[in-house]
């Protein structure tokens, strides 16, 4: 029976992007070679934070949990989920008529069929060119006020005709963040959207404000490398 290393799986709602507010079952796989310095899910890869008990979940059991939740769709995330062969999981979910979304940096070949691809590029391992055209939406993490211009110079987002979300890196806008830096990040997003319009959109991780993921006891606490751990970011 096919198994996958799963850090956590839980029933919640999508807190960002086009599908904001819709019910979703999240499967967070274990492992990530990208190693973003501000990662909010370092428990999936960082040697100082990885749990002793990494679940090896059977595909059939995962699918059963998804179906029982009666969610609108499933989100496979990480870590970096595309380092795993997800073809068995996506096939089994599609047999149950469950739409499959994936959140990825796009740096590795896709193995599996996905109905929605959120591609969030990372400087530490840039996306494969072949994956850019597969994106249903992009998500740029805005670390500082120069981030957007740097990313637009690197990737011609506008040519793909899909939404490009501009998300403040969460620790940069936390209560403990430097106010000048925080204002610079948020202002850069607002000004870019006002100046350039579509496909750019101002984004936010609304689920963190609701603290909704923790309502499911199967959800692990976030392990961030920046921000305020007591508040989950």
Kindly give the residue locations of the regions a language model identified.
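Flexible, acidic/Gly-rich N-terminal and inter-domain linker regions that tether
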Residues: 1-30, 34-38, 42-43, 201-203, ...
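Conserved Radical SAM active-site core
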Residues: 4-11, 23-24, 30, 35-115
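Conserved AdoMet/S-adenosylmethionine-binding subsite of the radical SAM
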Residues: 63, 82-233
